[in-house]
Amino acid sequence: MGKSYSSDGSHLCTVDTYDCCIYDGGWGGERPPKDAVEYPDREPDFVYEETYGLNWPLVYRPMGDWHQQHIDWSYTEQTGLERPIAHGVSSAGVAMRHAISLLFPGHPEAMTHLKCRFTSPVLPGVRLRTIVWKTGEGEARFRMVNADAPESKPFLNHGIVEWDASIA
């Protein structure tokens, strides 16, 4: 867990991260329940589309993730991918920016909670579609998909965003 503060010492956010080791396991016992999010059985309230820039992984590289899979085409081709993949923090940041623009535009300080599951890597150059269902006052569900192949596996799924509705 990490906490971020503004230059005047005001608390901005708390960041919790969890790693999922997909092919690890075998510890015995029952599997924990999946952290699933229920989506409303209706059309989404909002949709935001944007192309993920080819140079965005270079922008996120200074965040500390120096792995070759984000910038080295020859490396990623050896792993079976057609091109480098986006940083997870970048993909989540794009979804967060979309949510702010759609739900409480101009008031990023209103966000109190963002949670999502990374379910597929974003390839730079892909057109993203963030789909949002408002589920209550200051609460929404979202997922991010490939706008050109919306039936494919989502990039981000089980998304929750919450905000202080008194601010926005």
Region spans (language model):
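HotDog/MaoC-like acyl-thioester-processing domains
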Residues: M1-Y48, P124, I131-A168
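Catalytic strand-loop segment that frames the active site of acyl-thioester-processing enzymes
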Residues: D19-A86, I100
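Histidine (H) residue identity feature
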Residues: H11, H67-H70, H87, H98, ...
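Hydrophobic beta-strand-centered segment that forms part of the acyl-chain substrate-binding groove
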Residues: S91-T135, E139
